[in-house]
């Protein structure tokens, strides 16, 4: 019986394989992404309008949607009461509306994507922006981006549910809505797409990437008549940076990375402290609101979104003492408020605190413009806290349009991520999911099962038995430890010419033995003749798909032109050996062949 096969992959096989798996349905997803992008922009406008309405009503006791600035204002004890009232409202909304509105939105979006088949309750689409507007409008030290990501994602999910789509396609449209929201709020379509890739999609496929990009671009276009055009935080452009400046960018990145670790630890320490309180979580946001109000008495810059403060940091307007005060006050108030389970985003507070770290280092060293180092600190703290360095550097670039700062932004963001991945096992976003028992691996790599062929791991001397052999005879050979058949859970059945006729498994043997028919039953009669097979040039991924579809643990490997000609045997152990081989490549240290050639 022939058992040899070539390791080379025929051209006709590689010719039908492609770099990406996609089909024409990507065009349908792109078409659906267009209205989702427009909806994301409109929802962003509504959220910003709601924040202004609640801020005017809460602090100035007037009905208006005019943008207002809380920084520099003094509200006395009324300024302490307002965040408490806001916290009470949010607690009631979460208790009797939907608990999903608690938190800053991105972990909830991740949970819906990974565990909820990308299905989001319509109540969340309504309650999340309203609760966030109440939180921020009553002084909450949060940004609008987390809630708008969750809200945009909710609308994307709801829209997708109107059509016959797979869960994977719904995920694409959910993320498209999230990216559209971020693109519209900040006029940062590239950063929105990068955030989707680094944080939300968990894949790099045209099916998902292209529709998300379409939604982000559409949102940025629709944004213009709604929210205006141009960079959100225009700054004086900086010149080309020298080697010394780039070295300082690494210092800022390391400092921001350490700050990221400290802030993450502080947030979850506060969350743990609230969890120990002897009353229902519905009341926690009100207690967090008390911390907000008291913090506002000390430094009013901790109140609200604080975009004016962020812009001031980018322009280098703060002295060292003011930066230290801002960093401590904002860090404490934000951590306590977020730990209380209220509603609001993390991005704007992180920008403010990262900017304070960078500007402070710039002032202390006296190198260049403190505003530049504030920008580097902002990119770095995003890269460190959210583990999204590409998003961090491009986000600041799109906010300012200062393209000469890109090398410094890149160095700072990557340096911060390096620090946090060494110090912390998880980011501020994934830690919340881990506390619910859900671990997320965010590393992308080539699937070893897509890369390796069946011929790389198959048994080239497959276990075989003649079709007329009795079950009793085969059972005796296995019991004696006959190496030709004892090492596998299945044995291939061959006819007189050595051609594949069937397969018999250990469970088939046990059924016949228990029935007392072993001496009168042949292996061909006891086994299966309705065979699923694979080929030596098939990928392990394809072979595994066949196993899963047929609910079997082993496959005969046959010639592609003659499916009765056996060339090998593939079992679960062979597949696991492929995974082990890739693991050894990651962990085994050895010298390369170049040293051997020089001896």
Question: Model segments located where?
Answer:
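Alpha-helical transmembrane segments and immediately membrane-proximal extracytoplasmic
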Residues: 1-451, 455-461, 465-474, 478, ...
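Hydrophobic, well-ordered secondary-structure elements that form the walls
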Residues: 344, 387, 415, 457, ...
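Active/binding-pocket-proximal capping segment
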Residues: 349-358, 435-436, 497, 507-511, ...
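Generic long, charged, amphipathic alpha-helical segments
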Residues: 360-382, 512-532, 536-539, 543
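Short hydrophobic beta-strand motif reused across regulatory alpha/beta modules
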Residues: 394, 501-509, 567-575
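Bateman (tandem CBS) regulatory domains
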Residues: 450-463, 469-476, 508, 519-531, ...
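The conserved cystathionine-beta-synthase
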Residues: 465-488, 494, 511-516, 520, ...
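Juxtadomain coupling helices with adjacent low-complexity linkers
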Residues: 572-599
